[in-house]
Amino acid sequence: MAKEHNHLQDVFLNTLRKERIPVSVFLVNGIKLMGRIESFDQFVVLLKGQDQAAQMIFKHAISTISPSREVVLPQRDAEA
């Protein structure tokens, strides 16, 4: 179950990164950050803002990632 959750998370973040989709990242303390996903791993997301400054955000501090446009995820193999 955890592996599947991480798979969906990875696919979503990787799609945002590859398509360079601008995102709003809302932190658990209410702060809103804006930029593009530059990179990510198991624990952090690297967000690059319009001023090209990078911010490393710990995933446990993220509440929501909201893309600026619709995101079409790649189709997974036939699963029920």
Swiss-Prot record:
Residues annotated as domain Sm: 10-71
Keyword RNA-binding in record: yes
Keywords: RNA-binding, Stress response
Record Gene3D superfamilies: 2.30.30.100
CDD domains associated with the record: Hfq
Any one Gene Ontology BP term: regulation of DNA-templated transcription
GO cellular component labels: cytosol
Similarity comment text for this entry: Belongs to the Hfq family.
Record-given protein name: RNA-binding protein Hfq
Biological classification of the source: Bacteria, Pseudomonadati, Pseudomonadota, Betaproteobacteria, Nitrosomonadales
